[in-house]
Design a protein with these regions (language model features):
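Helix-coil boundary and interhelical linker segments in multi-pass alpha-helical membrane proteins
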Residues: 1-13, 76-96, 127-133, 166-177
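Loop-to-transmembrane alpha-helix initiation sites
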Residues: 135, 151-158, 169-184
Length: 215
């Protein structure tokens, strides 16, 4: 697989399609639709599902989670369909769509490039790319959350193991993408990492206005 064999315009389409889908701010749209105001003025100000839960409306939070995960999955699935009917390499199409969706959520053009932290979108991407790893990611998050009561630590551990799971299941063509996505997750969570190291990161259920590991 090399760049000389690829249909460059189609790869750009996959990247841009992913970005546009990923940049849809479901948390913001749903909180406003529910009459709860601007999610950026609530809690941590993050547009993800965790902060949506701070509105007190669990259905808005669930909708945000589904929407954020769904846009990542849809971006990957649509690019896969496009690749199946064109000469573009499928792995590159899927990878660029996934990367675009993730970047769109983290840096949405509509919100001044200030978005969420990407965990919900990452879950959707993984489930669409290779669902066993998506399930392993979710299971890892749940186990670490149950033991530690830290949402951010759960996200960081699951993300760190993501490339390991892909390699273990012999999906080497996706390992490079997963390493890049993991790096972006850690950059987005740098504030959480600092608070974990200093012992000031809030545990699940604790009230705090600062950002935690959110979608």
């Amino acid at each position: 697989m090399g760049f000389t064999d690829l249909a460059a315009p189609l790869l750009l389409v996959a990247l841009m399609l992913g970005y546009l889908l990923g940049s849809i701010p479901f948390g913001l749209l749903l909180t406003k639709a529910a009459g709860l105001g601007d999610i950026r003025d609530i809690g941590s100000g993050n547009i993800g599902a965790t902060n949506a839960l701070r509105t007190g409306n669990r259905w808005v939070a669930i909708g945000t989670l589904i929407g954020d995960a769904g846009k990542g999955a849809v971006a990957v699935l649509l690019s896969g369909l496009l690749a199946a009917h064109t000469s573009a390499d499928q792995t590159w199409m899927l990878s660029l769509a996934a990367l675009g969706a993730f970047l769109g959520h983290l840096y949405p053009v509509w919100l001044g490039f200030k978005g969420g932290k990407g965990i919900s979108t990452l879950i959707g991407i993984l489930l669409a790319l290779y669902w066993p790893v998506g399930l392993l990611f979710c299971a890892t998050w749940a186990i670490v959350a149950l033991v530690s009561r830290y949402s951010s630590l759960s996200a960081l551990v699951a993300t760190l193991l993501m490339p390991v799971y892909l390699a273990w299941l012999d999906r080497w063509e996706l390992v490079g993408l997963s390493v890049l996505l993991a790096a972006l997750v850690y950059i987005a969570h740098r504030g959480n990492i600092g608070r974990l190291l200093s012992g000031t990161e809030p545990r699940i259920g604790q009230k705090k206005a600062e950002d935690t590991a959110e979608g």
